[in-house]
Amino acid sequence: MNNDVRELRTRKGLSQGQLAQEMDVSRQTINAIETDRYTPSLPLAMALARFFAKSVEEVFHADDEQ
């Protein structure tokens, strides 16, 4: 699953650690999401989308979409 988390995070001027703190997860979790090594749980995906004022579909994309 592809995502725009890194782009959205950097637009807000946040480090991975800062976003992790906001989401109550580890920095390593944010890194794994950004590098497509980890697909977040639905609650985490929803929290990330809400944080960035986007829909889940705007943040996360199927592998064949962009």
Language-model features: locations:
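Short, basic-rich loop-to-helix N-cap that marks the start of a DNA-contacting helix
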Residues: R37-A47
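Residues in the helix-turn-helix
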Residues: Q18, T29, E58
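Recognition helix of helix-turn-helix/homeodomain-like DNA-binding domains
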Residues: V25-Y38
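Short basic helix-loop element that most often maps to the first helix and adjoining turn
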Residues: N3-E22
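Short, charged recognition helix plus adjacent turn
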Residues: R50, E58-Q66
